[in-house]
Every structure is written in C-alpha cells, then in structure tokens.
UniProtKB/Swiss-Prot annotation:
Described function: An essential GTPase which binds GTP, GDP and possibly (p)ppGpp with moderate affinity, with high nucleotide exchange rates and a fairly low GTP hydrolysis rate. Plays a role in control of the cell cycle, stress response, ribosome biogenesis and in those bacteria that undergo differentiation, in morphogenesis control.
Residue span(s) of domain OBG-type G: 160-331
CDD domains, sorted: Obg
Identification of the protein by name: GTPase Obg
Amino acid sequence: MRFVDEVVIKLQAGKGGNGCVSFRREKYVPRGGPDGGDGGNGGSIYLKADENVNTLIDYRYKREYYAENGRPGEGRNCYGKAGEDLYLVVPVGTSVFDIDTNKKIGEVLQHGQTFKLVSGGKRGIGNTHFKSSTNQAPRKFTLGEEGEYKEVRLELNLLADVALLGLPNAGKSTLIRSVSEATPKVADYPFTTMYPHLGVVKVGVDSFVMADIPGVIEGAAEGAGLGLRFLKHLTRARCVLHVVDICPFNESDPVENYFAVEKELEKYSQELFDKPRFLVINKIDLLADKVEQKCQEFVEQIGYQGKYYTISAAMKKGTDELAKKLNEFLQKQE
C-alpha cells in the first residue's frame, strides 16, 4: 500500500433540522394547543485513531466529507432524528492543521482516541416552546443552524521509540529487518527505502517500535532527496540511531558521510538534533581486519564522545546486543 502522510480535506458538518409548527388535532379536541417538535442536531465529524492504519492514502482520493443533516421536527411533539456523526479513521500520530490559519488544532496519539473536527448545527425549536399565557397558538419556530465548515490538513508523524537516521545505503533497512518483522526493501542502490517503515522489536517480555526513514543526503534540509519530507517522522521518537556505513561501496569517506548527516539534522530542527542519539557503525563484516581498531579510529576522527555500537546488520552480528541496550535505555526513560 502506498504511504501517504499529508492530505488536505474539506469538511461539512450536518445542518440542524428545523423546528415544526403543529397543533394538536383530535376528535374531541378541535382547538388543541401547539405540539410542534424540535428538529434534530446535525451530525459532527471526528478523527478517530486506529493502530491498524498506517497511511492517509484514503483521503488522497476523496477530499470532501459531509456529516448527515438533522431531520425536522414533527407534530405530537416528535423530535427530528439527529444527524449521524461521521468518523474519519486515521493512523495514530495524525495531527490536524487549519488551512486558513495554518495552526495546529488537534491530534490523536492513542488507539481509539477521537477529536472533533467540525460541529453539527443546533436543532431548530418547535412552536411548543413558544406557547405563553398571551399566545396560546404560537406559529413561531426556529430554523436549524448550519453545520460548521472547515478545510484542514492532516499530517502523519509516526510514533516510534527509536528512529534510524543515515545516508542512503547505510544499512538502516537491513538493521530493522534483522531485529524486527518489518520487511522494507533492501538493495545496493540509493533510496531503496521510499517511505517510512515501522518494526516492533521484541526483547524478552518487552518491546519497542523502531522506524526506518529514507536516507538523508546533503541538502536535505533545503529539500534535496527524500529526507526532508520524512525527517518529521523522527520528531516523536524517544531516541535516534545514526547508522554509518564503515565500508561504503562507493568508496566515500565515512567521516565526511557522518558529518553530512549531522549537519542536515541540525539545520532541519534543533529540537530534533538535541534528542538522545547513538552512533551505530554498520557493515563491520566488510572490514578485512583490525575491526575494533578501525572503528575506534573512526570514532576518534569524528570526535564522538557518546556510546556507540559496532554491528553487521546483514550478518546479524551485534544486533541482538544493540536491541537489548536500546530496550534498557528506553526502560530508564519511562
């Protein structure tokens, strides 16, 4: 299924039903009083989060949504039926922005959570309510109100505990495949990953969610490549893994590659740059010898002071230990 993480839709809540003008007319009550009922309220439109949905693609092809109108009131004090509410099912992590103001107006972050987008119009009042001591046969009633209209932008930011960051072909997709049941495409060419993937990593009785996004290239913060569009999916992650290919097939310099990604991350968002971040040195199986020494030299060259991990995602070497350490970190954060 195609991954869509941003759409614009138009919403029209239902109109309230009109109140009714009616008088009681029975065989032995020729001049009965007013008995016009109220109309029904118009239906509202809500977002509803569903953990089984992972894309906004349904809203790419249908852009306008209408809730049901309330029915008019009837005689014998019968109220009109309320318009049925409409629920738009979206992935967990979906935010809503008002198109007119470009301000965020809400979000749904938990399975089953709802958020009202537009409110249905209020019902009209029947003539029963207008009877008084001086007006025993009122013909006054009110119309139902129009439902609220709004144009909104839905944006999906994936909810993950750990996010993978790195250049194309750094081995991020192979890593997530090796520690979870996610199945992103893996190949030896840039941008094999065209959209984000989520994988559930199980460590004993615990588990956490890992996200793989398309690789970041130089200029991503200005829109180059695919990285800019998907960097936003890192914003809700609790920590970031910077995956570096220690032995690039294109013979590029791992040190330069490391700084290129770090630079783009900082330019994109200082908040994202300040998140807990760990270095993962991948593809150590391609180093002929002195693996530990070469990895240590790389770490010293980039001036990295934090915790780092050396792995071969393809050979599943060091990946279990990495998952275990990540789980320990996440448990301490709770």
